[in-house]
Structure formats: structure tokens, C-alpha cells
């Protein structure tokens, strides 16, 4: 704005001086040069002055043109300055906008840095949790391995119990078959006696009573066997439910120690080698036992069904057959009475002939004889199964005398053979 004021003032100053100068040129004495011939000497001075004036006018014209050019240049510079000022204002506005955008970007950057720090903290926390979970996975794998070993020990004990149960079942089934044979022989004998000699009502009633007692004894044996099976099944299920007990591991270890000591005493080097191989190949034995668990449970159920079917045997009943004696034959009456007394008080000829099996004990028909069965209480059986480390105090069922030793020896043989086969597999 100051430059514009300067240009206006300079133009206003030049305008009147220019007009005066032009008027002086019009009234110049050079026009009267011919008329003023009076003073020739002074005319030269005047001419020289006029020449100087002409030079000055020329220089003045040049200066005016230069001033006009300068004024035009000044106007152009002023217009450029105004444009530059406008551009400067625009650039200032843009700078302010850019500063605001820059501040916003800085705020966003700070927020992103905060988010990054939070995410890094979360990542570190998740990494720590991942490490903890990996440690837990390793511990769980170790626990799983220990549980698999416990399962193996439980399977071995279950196999031993199953074998003992099968041995007892076979033994009692043999005894029942022998008793059934004996009952059939007695029926044949009594039927022959009734057909040949006839029988009195009193002797028939006594024989029926004896047979009823015998049937009761058979029923008692069956009930004891079923009770034994139920207790064994309860013990097995209870032991299978409690797989995480240390007592089964100790029991298995004591059994292995007993086998090794027995083999050392009997100088059985093959058994010792197989036992060592079994201990070294414990993982393979675990896998094979896991495969055999389901088949063993199914065989146990099948054995239970077969035992239930064997219990459906009907009791024996005495058929009353009477032969009318001949009243005329006195000798026949005497013989029949003697035979009645002999058949009631003494052994029958069929029994005295030695046709009875050797395993059956010679007992009178009226005498009731049952196998001695140990009936442990529920609390004692549970403590023996769960908290007793000694295998000798585990709940057992005794067999009749004379058969205990053979059953235990065969059980030991089968158990040793089972250990040997398990080591080989």
C-alpha cells in the first residue's frame, strides 16, 4: 500500500511541471530568431541557451518516458505483490490446515502407540499362559502314563481274580456233576429196590426226607456259589472303579517279587529272564492288556450267564413205587424186611461196590454237608481291596478240604504261565 501511495504522489508531482515545461517550449525565443537580428552577438548566446534548453527538454522527455515506464513497472510489481499476498494468505490457511491435520495425525499416532503397548502386554500375557498350558500338558501326559501303568496293574489283578473265579466255578461244577451222578445212581438204586422188593411207607418217607435234605444242601451250595460270584463281581467292579489306588501297584509289585523269589528258590532261570523281559517291555504289555480288557469283561459276562443257566437245575424228587407183597410167600416177606433194614441202616450194594467217584465223600443221605465259605463283611472286603498291600489278606473263598492244595497249585501254575505269556507278548 505504501508503494501505491508513492506512485500516486510522484505522478501528481510530475504532471504540473510537465505542463509548465511544455508551455515554456511553446513560448521559446527560437521562433523569433529571424526578427531579432539587431543583437547578433547576443543571439549566439541565446542560441546556445536554446540548444541547452532543447537538450534539457530531450532529457526531460526521456526522463518522463522512463518515469512512465517505471510507473508501469511499479503497477505491475504492485499487482504481483497483491497476488503474492493473496497466495501468502492461501498458503497460511493451508499451513494452518496442515498443522491441524498434523496434530490429528500425532494424536492418532499416540493412540496407536498406546494400542500397540496394550497389545504387546496382552501378547506377553498370552505367551505366559501358553507356557503354563504347555507345562500342564506335560504334567498331564505324565499323569496319563502313570494312570496307564495303574490300569495295567489293575488288568493283571483282574485277570488273576478272573482265573481264580473260573477255577472255583470249574471245581464246583465238577462237584455238582458228581453229586448229580450220585443222585442218579441213588435214584436207580431206590427204584430197583422198590421194583424188586417193594418199600414201606415209613422207609419211603425217610428216603424222601433224606432226598429233600440232599436237595436243600445242593440249593445251599448253589446259593453259596451265586453269593460268591456276586461278591467277586462287586469286588471286581469296585477295584475297576478305583484305578488310582497305590495298593494295586504295591500288590502287583509284591506279586512280581514273590514270583522272582519263588523262581530264585526253585532255580528257574527261564522264569527270571522272562520276568526281567516283562519288566523291561512294560509298555508293550500295557498295550496288550488294554486290548484284552474288553474281551475279558465280555467273557466274564458270558461266564455269569452260564452260571445262571447252571443254577436252573431242578431238584430231585422221589417217585413212590410200591410192590404189593405176596402174602403166601413167607420167605419173600422175610427177605423184604431184611432188605428194608439193610437199605436203611447200612450202605447200599451199589455204594459198597465202589462205583461212587473218589472225590465224593462217603456221607449218609440224611447228613447235610456244605463247603466252608468265608463271608467277609462289606467294610472288611473294601479295606482288603483298597487299603491292604499284602496279597495274602485279600478276600478269598475256601474250597473243601482235600482240594485246596491242588487248586492253589494249579492257580499258581496258571498265574505263572500268564506272567510268562505276557512277557513274551
From Swiss-Prot:
GO function terms (MF aspect):
RNA binding
Q: Which gene encodes it?
A: SHE3
* List of residues that carry Phosphoserine: 343, 394
Q: What does this protein do?
A: RNA-binding protein that binds specific mRNAs including the ASH1 mRNA, coding for a repressor of the HO endonuclease. Part of the mRNA localization machinery that restricts accumulation of certain proteins to the bud and in the daughter cell. Required for the delivery of cortical endoplasmic reticulum into the emerging bud.
Assigned GO CC terms: endoplasmic reticulum membrane
Could you list this entry's UniProt keywords, alphabetically sorted.
Answer: Coiled coil, Endoplasmic reticulum, Membrane, mRNA transport, Phosphoprotein, RNA-binding, Transport
Region (Disordered) residue ranges read: 24-45, 322-425
Q: Where in the cell is it found?
A: Endoplasmic reticulum membrane
Taxonomic lineage is: Eukaryota, Fungi, Dikarya, Ascomycota, Saccharomycotina
Keyword RNA-binding (UniProt): yes
Bilayer topology? Peripheral membrane protein
Q: What is this protein called?
A: SWI5-dependent HO expression protein 3
Q: Which family does it belong to?
A: Belongs to the SHE3 family.
Locate the compositionally biased regions of type Polar residues: 35-45, 345-358, 382-397
Q: Where is it mostly found? A: endoplasmic reticulum
Q: Which residues form a coiled coil?
A: 68-197
Q: Where in the sequence does UniProt note compositional bias of the Low complexity kind? A: 326-338
